Design a protein with these regions (language model features):
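Short, basic/aromatic recognition patches
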Residues: 226-235
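Iron-sulfur (Fe-S) cluster-binding segments and ferredoxin-like electron-carrier domains
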Residues: 20-28, 259-262, 298-332
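Flexible glycine/acidic-rich beta-alpha junction loops that bind and position SAM and/or redox cofactors
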Residues: 150, 169-189, 213-226, 259-261
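Short, small/polar residue-rich loop motifs at catalytic or cofactor-binding pockets
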Residues: 237-241
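C-terminal accessory region of radical SAM enzymes
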Residues: 192-226, 251-309
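N-terminal pre-core extensions flanking Radical SAM catalytic domains
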Residues: 1-28, 40-44, 247, 270, ...
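Radical SAM/AdoMet-radical enzyme domain recognition
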Residues: 3, 18, 29-56, 60-176, ...
Length: 334
């Protein structure tokens, strides 16, 4: 099971698509003491992987202390970072604290395009420098890419790039228009474009030696099955089943792109929230509406619950409209 803690709202970039609308520090952020107590509750709940994200998690002064505490509880600490703040010293301290892998964002092989998307000139160069620092420290890293219409044709090239520089994984995030992302909703791929890209990604995954995983596009499990391409992933959308997020202020939600509150760690221990929250209990019924509820791939895909909520007035159990198979739009097997 995986939990992601958005450790801070503070960030040194101004990314167009940021789901958290990160920029400045939020005065309500969990303190070091609160964070450590929550980490112990996460371990008690049976979670294995803890993602430190943000904002930019490396902007927290106590980040090394928190990572070390997570590792001491038997958790596997990993990161979601823009990579620009990773120096040799930072990489060494992360490794010593027990960090297992750094998820670093690269949205284009064209530095100018990446920088424009990330809102800061020079971000691409700083990110690549951060990757090199990880390599020198012996710290595993993976590449994260957000898909929009202008980089769609680069995605498989970025996978090749990720493999060439020694990444262990390429995680490909399909844009969900929340946070600042709602202002660039028009850059999201259309339904059939989603389907075509998923086919390209799964074919590429079969060619390369590194792990490749689409995120926020749970239909990839169906696509892989239809193409006869084996994948180690047995479930598409994990929200509330084996995954959740905790906001910088302690609010627990099923995923980073959903606004439904499942609880507050300042009011109730995390392990109790995970076990008893009505939001999580409803998600675990898998009683989906519309096409998702009738789909023969429901058990492995589950539809994107965040998209269901966004496009169906908050009903996170509704159908995922971004599925070509469900809408019988010329997709194989539909």
């Amino acid at each position: 099971m995986i939990v992601s803690w958005m450790t801070t709202n503070k960030c040194n970039l101004k990314c167009e698509h940021c789901y958290q609308d990160a920029a400045d520090c939020d005065s309500r952020e969990l303190t070091t003491v609160e964070g450590k107590a929550m980490i112990e509750q996460i371990a008690r709940a049976g979670f294995k992987i803890m993602i430190f994200s943000g904002g930019e998690p490396l902007m927290r002064d106590d980040i090394f202390e928190l990572v070390a505490h997570a590792a001491a509880q038997g958790l596997r600490p990993v990161f979601g970072s823009n990579g620009t703040l990773i120096t040799d010293e930072v990489a060494r301290k992360l490794k010593e604290a027990g960090a297992c892998s750094m998820g670093i964002s690269v949205d284009s092989l064209d530095a100018a395009k990446h920088d424009a998307f990330r809102g800061v000139e020079g971000a691409h160069a700083d990110t690549l420098a951060g990757i090199e620092a990880c390599k020198r420290a012996g710290l595993d890293f993976q590449i994260h890419t957000t898909v929009v219409n202008w980089n769609r044709n680069e995605i498989c090239d970025i996978t090749d790039f990720a493999q060439s520089i020694g990444a262990v994984n390429h995680s490909i995030f399909f844009l969900i228009p929340v946070g600042r992302g709602k202002y660039i909703e028009e850059t999201s791929l259309k339904v059939l474009e989603n389907e075509a890209l998923l086919q390209d990604i799964m074919r590429k995954a079969a060619e390369v030696d590194i792990d490749v995983k689409p995120t926020c596009a749970p239909q990839f499990t169906r696509v892989a099955d239809q193409l006869g391409i084996p994948t180690r992933y047995t479930r598409g959308c994990l929200a509330g089943l084996t995954y959740c997020v905790i906001g910088s202020e302690g609010i627990v939600r099923p995923c980073a792109y959903m606004t439904e509150d499942a609880g507050d760690v300042r009011e109730q221990p995390f392990d109790e929230i995970w076990a008893t929250s009505p939001v999580f209990e409803r998600l675990r019924t898998q009683a989906y509406g519309g096409n998702c509820g009738e789909c023969d791939h429901k058990e492995h895909c589950g539809g994107c619950r965040a998209r269901a909520a966004y496009y169906h007035d908050g009903d996170y159990m509704a159908q995922d409209d971004y599925c070509a198979y469900g809408q019988k739009l010329g997709c194989k097997g539909a």
